[in-house]
């Protein structure tokens, strides 16, 4: 009773503090740096539906673009190693973001259960399925984690294309360059069953959709040297 109310208050707090401060800060950064932002496809999403968003990972400014302009309350799913970063790891944990521990099937299952508890009433999940920023502007291969989670929870996967972040600050760059960013939200991919075949089909369809809105110069898969870590 009382403990359940307290838990709900904490959850509501995590939903607020884990999203809105980041959204406002991200919008402010883009406005202060005079970075134009264009959003395509928001009308494809239903307001109170939870999704698993899978964007490509062009650069550091991906975070500002998604936080500031996706227009959905969401949780990040991130690598367990990020939990060790001083202050950042604790802040992300307090905000209810989800760390993936792949050290055993039991830990993976625990991650899925945590996600299931968080993804209600339109709160969604954002995962970079490449697992690392690109060095070239091209997409690397997609890892299975986000798609396994969507399959387990029977949630629709939404492919998202980020374009322009690589030009602003590439992974090997030191200086910020003003450039327009475009966020393209593709049609949600509803589950077509459950299991390995659904996961494979969704991964392939999502990859094709994300790549379709990239400029020609960035089309074609180029594996990142640190994707397997």
Pin down the residues of each PLM region.
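Membrane-embedded segments
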Residues: 58-110, 114
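Hydrophobic/aromatic ligand-binding patch that stacks against planar heteroaromatic rings
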Residues: 29, 66, 91, 148-152
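Short gly/ser/thr-rich secondary-structure transition/capping motifs
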Residues: 33-40, 108-109, 165-167
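Short, small-residue-biased leader/transition segments that mark boundaries at the very start
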Residues: 1-6
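N-terminal signal-anchor transmembrane helix
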Residues: 7-61, 65-68
């Amino acid at each position: 009773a009382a403990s359940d109310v307290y838990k709900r208050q904490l959850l509501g707090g995590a939903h607020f503090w884990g999203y809105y401060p980041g959204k406002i800060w991200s919008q402010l950064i883009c406005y202060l740096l005079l970075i134009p932002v264009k959003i395509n496809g928001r009308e494809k999403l239903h307001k109170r539906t939870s999704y698993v968003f899978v964007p490509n990972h062009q650069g550091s400014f991906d975070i500002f673009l998604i936080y500031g302009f996706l227009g959905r309350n969401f949780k990040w799913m991130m690598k367990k190693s990020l939990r060790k970063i001083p202050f950042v790891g604790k802040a992300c944990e307090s905000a209810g973001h989800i760390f993936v521990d792949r050290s055993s099937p039991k830990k993976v299952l625990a991650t899925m259960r945590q996600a299931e508890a968080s993804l209600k009433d339109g709160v969604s999940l954002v995962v970079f399925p490449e697992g690392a920023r690109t060095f070239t502007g091209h997409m690397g291969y997609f890892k299975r984690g986000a798609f396994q989670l969507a399959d387990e929870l029977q949630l629709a996967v939404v492919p998202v294309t980020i374009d322009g972040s690589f030009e602003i600050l590439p992974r090997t760059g030191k200086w910020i360059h003003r450039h327009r960013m475009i966020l393209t939200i593709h049609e949600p991919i509803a589950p077509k069953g459950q299991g390995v075949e659904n996961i494979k089909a969704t991964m392939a369809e999502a990859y094709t959709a994300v790549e379709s809105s990239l400029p020609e110069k960035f089309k074609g898969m180029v594996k990142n040297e640190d994707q397997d870590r």
